[in-house]
């Protein structure tokens, strides 16, 4: 039984997505009361909260998954405080759950077993910027927008851009991605080094303290072990990231198509032609309609590609020429251009607002995002089949995706008080995930496993790989205190 269905067993009239909680830690008499005093000796009175509103805020993210709040929320201001607090938790066997901005979509911050939430928002400094080396080190409270604002006058930027203004260390923890991944890669290839506090309070530097080479062959890749670990192996307290030069020119375009097939075929052909496109995003007719209504736009309500080209003026001419020829051959419209920064900003804001635009289609309902990713050659087939599945089962699920790397989302909007609809959505998400696995893809391209995809992870990687992961977890966190119940 998947967590999605287990959640129904703990349903309420308002929100059936409630996961059960086994309070095997904090139920021990007096444990929380004793540790709060110890926490305050480290972080001060203002750095510790047991207030119900604060705990509720830090016990949920943007997902449909709902758990009980943590017992305590701490607000460390330095890695030394994180380490000291972790040692207290380790001694009392209290679970630790890291919290960045709460924008995750897989229930990664839920306190399944109670414990202590480490809210890292006060650690918000950009520590070391090396302009000549194109890298920067940040604390976990720095968000992607905050970093790019800091970099505004340097000629550099950090391009990984998930829809929300997520914290950069949270993005590393989930191996996040975004609209620029087709050109600049995901978090996994843009993290050079991490500082991590382990379950017992030990501080680990995954590539060696202060090291930031662009490449290394020195031993096991511990940095990539922690990227995507979702807080289950340790708390990330610093990240050293690659930066990129801001391109000489950027231009965006919108192109409409007569069918889903023709739009996705164009995507595959553009990539196969070797066009170094910076962004290529697909929105189906339902999603375009939602974006139009939410952002007061007037794009044609048909399957659509949002595209962006980066480079020199001369280089972009060739990119645009090839792309226009391909889209025209597939029945695409003439490009509607967005050349100045303000117009491009409105276009990409509409794409980044897709989650909220989808929610606005059915006020009062909840949203759930799928996250499959397949090899790009299988993309036309899976999107067409998925669209047919949505229509056949009367599910509101506008599609948007980073189709340049084979990743797309169905932003499913549903009434959680309607058991028939919940069951139809559950069955659909299971079919979609297994359709992706059958096409040599993955159940999650960028959101992570969290609470809801643990069974699918086992299907995807197999029992032996799960055993290896469990062995790594047991070595680094033998008491299972780091974000228990997630991933594995």
Which residues fall in each region the model found?
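N-terminal flexible segment immediately upstream of the FAD-binding catalytic core
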Residues: 2-87, 104-134, 287-295, 341-369, ...
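Alpha-helix capping/hinge segments and adjacent helical runs
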Residues: 44-45, 437-449, 474, 478-482
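C-terminal substrate-recognition/cap domain of FAD-linked oxidoreductases
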Residues: 49-58, 241-245, 254-259, 264-431, ...
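Conserved, mostly hydrophobic/aromatic
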Residues: 89, 231, 410, 477
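FAD-binding subdomain of flavoenzyme oxidoreductases
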Residues: 125-281, 482
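Activity-critical C-terminal alpha-helical subdomain
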Residues: 202, 454-488
């Amino acid at each position: 039984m998947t967590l999605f269905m287990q959640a129904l067993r703990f349903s309420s009239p308002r929100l059936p997505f409630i996961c059960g909680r086994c309070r095997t830690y904090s139920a021990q008499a007096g444990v929380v009361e004793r540790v709060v005093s110890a926490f305050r000796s480290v972080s001060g009175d203002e750095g510790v909260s047991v207030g119900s509103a604060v705990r509720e805020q830090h016990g949920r993210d943007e997902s449909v998954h709902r758990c009980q709040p943590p017992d305590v929320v701490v607000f460390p201001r330095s890695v030394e405080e994180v380490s000291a607090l972790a040692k207290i938790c380790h001694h009392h066997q209290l679970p630790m759950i890291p919290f960045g901005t709460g924008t995750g979509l897989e229930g990664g911050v839920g306190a399944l077993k109670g414990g202590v939430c480490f809210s890292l928002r006060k650690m918000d400094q950009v520590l070391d910027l090396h302009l000549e080396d194109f890298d920067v080190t940040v604390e976990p409270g720095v968000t992607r927008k905050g970093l790019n604002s800091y970099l505004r006058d340097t000629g550099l930027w950090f391009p990984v851009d998930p829809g929300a203004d997520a914290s950069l260390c949270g993005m590393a923890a989930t191996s996040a991605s975004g609209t620029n991944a087709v050109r600049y890669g995901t978090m996994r290839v843009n993290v050079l080094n991490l500082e991590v506090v382990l379950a017992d309070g030990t501080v680990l530097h995954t590539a060696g303290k202060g090291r930031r080479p662009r490449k290394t062959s020195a031993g096991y890749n511990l940095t990539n072990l922690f990227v995507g670990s979702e807080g289950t192996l340790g708390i990330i307290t610093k990240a050293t990231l690659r930066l990129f030069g801001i391109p000489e020119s950027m231009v965006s375009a919108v192109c409409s198509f007569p069918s889903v097939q023709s739009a996705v075929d164009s995507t595959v052909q553009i990539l196969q032609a070797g066009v170094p496109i910076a962004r290529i995003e697909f929105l189906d007719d339902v999603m375009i309609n939602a974006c139009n209504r939410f952002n007061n736009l007037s794009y044609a309500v048909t399957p659509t590609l949002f595209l962006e080209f980066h480079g020199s003026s001369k280089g972009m001419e060739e990119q645009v020429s090839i792309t226009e020829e391909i889209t025209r051959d597939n029945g695409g419209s003439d490009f509607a251009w967005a050349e100045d920064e303000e117009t491009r900003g409105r276009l990409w804001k509409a794409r980044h607002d897709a989650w909220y635009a989808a929610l606005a289609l059915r006020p009062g309902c909840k949203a759930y995002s799928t996250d499959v990713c397949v090899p790009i050659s299988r993309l036309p087939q899976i999107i067409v089949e998925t669209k047919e599945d949505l229509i056949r089962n009367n599910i509101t699920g506008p599609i948007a995706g980073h189709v340049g790397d084979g990743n797309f989302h169905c932003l499913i909007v549903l009434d959680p008080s309607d058991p028939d609809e919940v069951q139809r959505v559950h069955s659909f998400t299971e079919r979609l995930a297994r359709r992706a696995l059958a096409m040599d893809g993955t159940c999650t391209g960028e959101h992570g496993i969290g609470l809801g995809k643990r069974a699918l992870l086992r299907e995807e990687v197999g029992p032996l790989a799960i055993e290896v992961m469990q062995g790594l977890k047991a070595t680094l966190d033998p008491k299972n205190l780091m974000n228990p119940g997630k991933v594995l």
